């Protein structure tokens, strides 16, 4: 056992003495030691109950002959951090979480690991940390939130609440209606109910084989979720000493491909591109952002979930057959994109796991023949505005897929929010938000507030938004993020001026600004990047080490 280094032999008497102080007995030193990486935090709706779930998990681990040791990671709620300086810390928190797991697991030589994330950057951060440790690992999240309803019975969620702000500003809804949405959009604990970043990543954990079936769709705070946690506790004890289930043996190149295939089929959050690039690098997989379009071109988009389809939520996907039904349906298009032979933590191959699964509601999960689109729900655009690529969630486009318009430039998200609210942006404009990339922000803020204001003001089909920052999974519209190179590193987005004509064509994967070579060279010679005053020491450290979005915004070693 890996843990023998802290518990076997006479030289480890001091170590055992310390472990006895935690309650261990003689018989425990012959058992596998299991790390339980929890992310309990009271301010996050998807996490405030994870302390109770961890107790259920640890109890099951003890019953099955192993010794659990719970530790905690930090967490940031992107929704609460949205639209102010707190969002600067969201993406950097991913690295702290990864470092935390690497530190605790390796410092104490634990044999196996169960990760209990749920929201936003916590899932990818834990995956990255687990890959560094490389022991048998199971992911079991806290589960998605129920959707909310208005008094009239209309389904709503967090995206509704953000867009309601713009509607209130334009007097489309009253203060009373805004309050009704506020009080009903998030009716229970869990990860926000749409196909936002948290639920996107939790479903991809199923596709990668590192979580048990149902991880992405079984609702939080239900008996079914508690049983899933018990199953994870039993299973980790079965595989704790089996090298076949080291996470790098499960999350390999084929698993990365499977995750991206499922992501395209479901129109996941654009953040998944950033996180899968980072995860692939930790897994030793050479994934390039340019490869994603080939996957998208071969995968039908068969499930639309809020915000792309506001009435459909994760509980509906679960009711319609869950991820197994989605994966089974994708596999019917026999084009070699899915690797059904890949092993999962349950001991089954992915193909065996989905088995005889079938769609129970074709209005929620479509057949391939009746797909929303013959191509996937995400795309990577290239051009003189994004030589290293940028990302758009095509599943969320509400207007035309081809757009040309005049640039309206802002050097921060705060400037953009003020400009949109004051009416500076009109039909036919391309909103440019720059100096919000991984290094320029720093921290690559999510632009849900600006995009929600655009939608709420009725401009969703008539305005495009481009940024070197990123978007919440709740964003919809012609919103293009992750532009690389970013403004802070001299990218073309930093050279744009108000009135420049920008051409976007999603179907040809292109994004360009109409500038002559002479004008471009002139602007480059005159370019001086905006320098922001940073008060946080961690943000200054992060800014020095972070790479751009085309590399997953990972830190340089």
Swiss-Prot record:
> Which positions does UniProt annotate for [2Fe-2S] cluster binding?
119, 192
> What PROSITE patterns does the database record attribute to this sequence?
ILVD_EDD_1, ILVD_EDD_2
- Please name the pathway: Amino-acid biosynthesis; L-isoleucine biosynthesis; L-isoleucine from 2-oxobutanoate: step 3/4; Amino-acid biosynthesis; L-valine biosynthesis; L-valine from pyruvate: step 3/4
Q: Say yes or no: keyword Lipoprotein present.
A: no
| Positions contributing to Mg(2+) binding | 78, 120-121, 446
* Reactions accelerated catalytically: (2R)-2,3-dihydroxy-3-methylbutanoate = 3-methyl-2-oxobutanoate + H2O; (2R,3R)-2,3-dihydroxy-3-methylpentanoate = (S)-3-methyl-2-oxopentanoate + H2O
NCBIfam families per record: ilvD, PRK00911.1
> Any idea what this protein is called?
Dihydroxy-acid dehydratase
* Lineage start: Bacteria, Pseudomonadati, Campylobacterota, Epsilonproteobacteria, Campylobacterales
Query: Gene behind this chain?
Result: ilvD
């Amino acid at each position: 056992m890996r843990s023998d280094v802290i518990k076997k032999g006479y030289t480890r008497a001091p170590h055992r003495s310390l472990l006895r102080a935690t309650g261990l007995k003689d018989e425990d030193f012959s058992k596998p030691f299991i790390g339980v990486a929890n992310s309990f935090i009271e301010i996050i709706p998807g996490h405030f109950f994870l302390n109770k779930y961890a107790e259920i998990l640890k109890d099951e681990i003890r019953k099955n002959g192993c010794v659990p040791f719970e530790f905690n990671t930090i967490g940031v709620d992107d929704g609460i951090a949205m639209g102010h300086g707190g969002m600067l810390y969201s993406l950097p928190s991913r690295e702290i979480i990864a470092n935390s797991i690497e530190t605790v697991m390796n410092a104490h030589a634990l044999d196996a690991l169960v990760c209990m994330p749920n929201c936003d950057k916590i899932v990818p951060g834990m995956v990255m940390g687990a890959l560094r440790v490389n022991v048998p690992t199971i992911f079991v999240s806290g589960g998605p939130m129920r959707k909310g309803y208005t008094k009239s019975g209309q389904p709503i969620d967090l995206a509704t609440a953000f867009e309601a702000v713009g509607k209130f500003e334009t007097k489309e809804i009253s203060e009373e209606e805004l309050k009704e949405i506020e009080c009903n959009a998030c009716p229970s604990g869990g990860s926000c109910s749409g196909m936002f970043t948290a639920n996107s990543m939790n479903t991809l954990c199923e596709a990668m084989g590192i979580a048990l079936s149902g991880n992405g769709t079984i609702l939080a705070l239900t008996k079914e979720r508690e049983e899933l946690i018990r199953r994870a506790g039993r299973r980790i004890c079965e595989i704790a000493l089996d090298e076949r289930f080291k996470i790098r043996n499960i999350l390999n190149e084929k698993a990365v491909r499977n995750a991206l295939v499922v992501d395209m089929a479901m129109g996941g959050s654009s953040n998944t591109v950033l996180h899968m690039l980072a995860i692939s690098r930790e897994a030793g997989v050479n994934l390039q952002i340019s490869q994603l379009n080939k996957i998208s071109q071969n995968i039908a988009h068969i499930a639309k979930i809020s915000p792309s389809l506001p009435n459909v939520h994760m509980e509906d996907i679960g009711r319609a057959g869950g991820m197994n039904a989605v994966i089974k349906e994708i596999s019917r298009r026999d084009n070699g994109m899915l690797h059904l032979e890949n092993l999962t933590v349950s001991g089954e191959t992915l193909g065996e796991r989905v088995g005889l699964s079938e769609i129970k509601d074709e209005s929620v999960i479509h057949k391939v023949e009746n797909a929303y689109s013959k191509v996937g729900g995400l795309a990577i655009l290239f051009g003189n505005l994004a030589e290293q690529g940028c990302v758009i969630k095509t599943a969320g486009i509400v207007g035309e897929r081809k757009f040309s318009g005049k640039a309206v430039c802002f050097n921060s998200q705060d400037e953009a929010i003020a400009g949109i609210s004051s009416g500076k942006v009109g039909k036919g404009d391309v909103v440019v938000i720059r100096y919000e990339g991984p290094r320029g922000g720093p921290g690559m803020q999510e632009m849900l507030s600006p995009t929600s204001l655009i939608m709420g003001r009725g401009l969703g089909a008539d305005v495009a938004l481009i940024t070197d920052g990123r978007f919440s999974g709740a964003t919809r519209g012609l919103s293009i993020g992750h532009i690389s190179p970013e403004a802070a590193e001299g990218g073309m987005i930093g050279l744009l001026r108000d009135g420049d004509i920008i051409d976007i064509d999603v179907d040809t994967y292109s994004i360009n600004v109409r500038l002559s070579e002479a004008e471009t060279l002139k602007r480059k010679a005159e370019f001086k990047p905006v320098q922001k005053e940073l008060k946080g020491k961690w943000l200054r450290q992060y800014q020095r080490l972070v790479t751009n979005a085309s590399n997953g915004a990972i830190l340089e070693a």
